[in-house]
């Protein structure tokens, strides 16, 4: 459908009404929905590009529920502000922005999306929409994990401290490596295939080790019996025991993947070590008083990108935003072997 064929009150979108395996053509469908109107703190954004993340496949995963109207997924976008709410102060129509959005509101796989200005920032000037869309969710996750949950300093005060990153080649790991390098941290990053090892090294990993082999022996060969902090962007359960073994006394572990079985926190007691979750949707989901922290975070990162200190983690653009391309993106994510980020751009 051409834009001129559309009623100005409607928009193109990709959604779901049933939760189905990704190979089912009905798992994600092209649809026409009412165009939303911004609330007081909202921006109405014309979406130009989106990225996909594991949260998309988790939300879409098969279950018995049925949606009366199509549910729109997608939590990574870049686009142009079309209209603003009555209390918006940070943006104006025409601004080019990037954001991840809120897990409890309609997502970015639509031609227009309403998003709270407090979790949005101007996109990097040096990136096009596709390059920018690859970054928001993973950047917020990595920044909050390293510099808020683990308490490391973003600007070098902790230079030389050791950080183990489990899952270095994925979307979050790819930006975490860059942030840690900039902070002067000594990173030990896990990867396994030649292409993922090279990717991690190119992003600035100090050391790369094989997650298919025992981690303690590989760390010891590099001169590390323990590490000051651990960021696990892969499987929390699978690495729990070894993380508890490798963390230094009074160190901290951060994870982002929900556990499948109870975690034995007692393994950390003698070391007075801490464990903390990172979920980048927390601020928007609960409307925390510091929601605007994500606006500031993305604003700062945009400056770092434009200064050449960080680079996009875009790996491949799969084509325009439609159901067929999004199903392919979900299919690739579910394989669990991706490098960097997948993006869709244009309608």
Predicted ranges, named:
Residues 267-318:
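C-terminal substrate-binding/catalytic core of Rossmann-like NAD(P)-dependent dehydrogenases/reductases
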Residues 181-240:
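Adenosine-nucleotide cofactor-binding segment
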Residues 100-167:
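NAD(P)H dinucleotide-binding glycine-rich loop of Rossmann-like/cofactor-binding domains
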Residues 2-9, 307-316, 327-347:
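C-terminal capping/lid region of NAD(P)-dependent oxidoreductase domains
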Residues 34-51, 61-104:
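Glycine-rich beta-strand-centered segment in the early N-terminal region that forms part
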Residues 169, 173, 177:
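N-terminal Rossmann NAD(P)H-binding glycine-rich loop of SDR-like oxidoreductase domains
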Residues 167-168, 235:
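NAD(P)H cofactor-binding loop motif with strongest signal on the N-terminal glycine-rich segment
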Residues 247-248:
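Helix-to-beta-strand junctions that scaffold the AdoMet/dcAdoMet cofactor pocket
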